Regions:
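Juxtamembrane intracellular "pre-TM" segments in multi-pass secondary transporters
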Residues: 1-2, 185-217
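Extracytoplasmic
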Residues: 8-42, 230-235
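C-terminal transmembrane helical hairpin of 12-TM major facilitator-type secondary transporters
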Residues: 278-324
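Helix-loop-helix hairpin linking two adjacent transmembrane segments in secondary transporters
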Residues: 98, 127, 135-181
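Helix-breaking motifs and short loop linkers at transmembrane-helix boundaries and internal kinks
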Residues: 39, 71, 92-98, 109, ...
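Conserved MFS/SLC helix-loop-helix module at the cytosolic interface between two early adjacent transmembrane helices
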Residues: 58-97
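Cytoplasmic helix-loop-helix junction between adjacent transmembrane helices
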Residues: 102-143
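Paired small-residue
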Residues: 82, 86-89, 97-106, 305-313
């Protein structure tokens, strides 16, 4: 009998959370080559991240309420099947427009993963148990940003960009199998509620005046805004400003991913000892320091290693803050965890898309757009924490 505990269960939650990271991080080294393959400018590669994020946001608005009505597993299976189909369309198309449409659908379907991973964690009872489950799953999720760019770089050398989308098809199949084997239904029928516009409106109004939810969501939104600028334009910046070939960006990005995993590990290990609020404070201070550093670098022409030091510090803070701020925001949600997770995820992904498009729009062939977007995000995280620290 499947039980909501154990390493396999946590690993599967991590895989669900990783549907976003796997789908976007694997694209990072390939964005400039894909753009060139379709005769597009390098900055157009950011649209692949942006369209996924927009679709992802709309998906989050759907999967949470559906899971509150029908349980966690039926929407999960349906969306995972759609995710696999969209990946196959992207792999087979010869049209950049169809590719972007496929990325939108892939994002829409992929929204089920983080939404239901968070809702399933909240079903465990809330409080420290939810925070620990999300933090542990986030550590597992960290494998995706470490290995996905390395896999993409290898596929670019051994084959071409289409192999990247076939890899996502295989990942989707693995997620479905893992859910079937290890994840039980955590929302029993007696606790399910039929979604309605009126009910969702009432729930949303309650959440919009709940400070803990608002500050937790704002922190998640802001930390993703800066991170998605890195995903959207990191490869283009290093190739254009520093001459780094796309196939070498995967190993460089893996350094960031290790920093993310270390940040998530620190949050998971230290939150129980020092308290969630203390670790969020440390993450906000780290993010603020990286933001000031990156904004200062925008005024000079730093070596790549100096620029990447600021980026790595930000990503470490990203790993530290993400799961704990999400858990803090969901803690007051109670029985409407699915709707709360959808609202949080929708806000997060729309800001994610905005971060990618902002970095692309500001791109002038130098490092400055990356520094501006990530730097402002880091400083804003510190400001948000200072204003809402009693709730975080």
């Amino acid at each position: 009998m499947k039980r909501a505990e154990g390493a396999a269960f946590v690993a599967t939650l991590g895989a669900l959370l990783a549907m976003t990271a796997a789908s976007n991080d694997i694209m990072v080294p390939a964005q400039p080559p894909i753009a060139r393959a379709f005769g597009m400018p390098e900055a157009a590669g950011a649209a692949m991240v942006g369209m996924f994020s927009v679709g992802f946001g709309f998906g989050l608005a759907v999967w949470g309420p559906l899971s509150d009505r029908f349980g966690r597993l039926p929407p999960l299976y349906a969306a995972a099947a759609g995710y696999i189909l969209a990946g196959a369309v992207c792999a087979l198309t010869d049209s950049f427009g169809v590719l972007l449409a496929g990325r939108f659908v892939q994002g829409f379907m992929g929204g089920v993963g983080p939404t239901l991973a968070r809702a399933i964690s909240r079903d465990l009872g809330g409080g420290a148990r939810t925070a620990q489950a999300l933090s542990a799953a986030t550590v597992v999720q960290g494998a995706a940003p470490v290995f996905a760019p390395l896999l993409a770089s290898g596929l670019l050398v051994a084959a071409d960009w289409r192999g990247i989308f076939w890899a996502l098809v295989v990942f989707g199949l693995a997620v479905i199998l893992s859910v079937m084997l290890f994840v039980p239904e955590t929302l029993p029928p007696e606790k399910r509620e039929a979604p309605s516009i009126r009910q969702m409106g009432r729930e949303t109004r309650v959440l919009m005046v709940t400070p803990g939810f608002l500050y937790g969501t704002a922190m998640v939104m802001t930390v993703f805004f800066g991170y998605m600028a890195l995903l959207g334009m990191g490869a283009a910046v290093t190739e254009s400003a520093y001459g780094l070939p796309p196939e070498w960006f995967g190993p460089l990005f893996a350094v960031n991913s290790v920093a993310y995993v270390l940040g998530a590990l620190a949050a998971n290990r230290l939150a129980g000892r020092f308290g969630v609020s203390t670790i969020i404070r440390a993450g906000a201070l780290t993010a603020g320091a990286s933001g000031v550093f990156l904004l200062a670098l925008s005024a000079v022409a730093p070596p790549l290693i100096v620029l990447w030091t600021g980026v790595v510090i930000y990503v470490f803070a990203f790993g530290t803050l993400l799961a704990l701020c999400a858990a803090r925001g969901l803690e007051p949600a109670g029985a409407v965890a699915g709707t709360a997770a959808s609202i949080m995820g929708l806000a997060q992904t729309l800001f994610s898309a905005a971060g990618a498009f902002a970095a692309a729009g500001l791109f002038d062939g130098s490092h400055r757009s990356l520094c501006w977007v990530m730097g402002v995000s880091g400083v804003m995280l510190l400001v948000l924490w200072a204003k809402g620290r009693r709730y975080l």
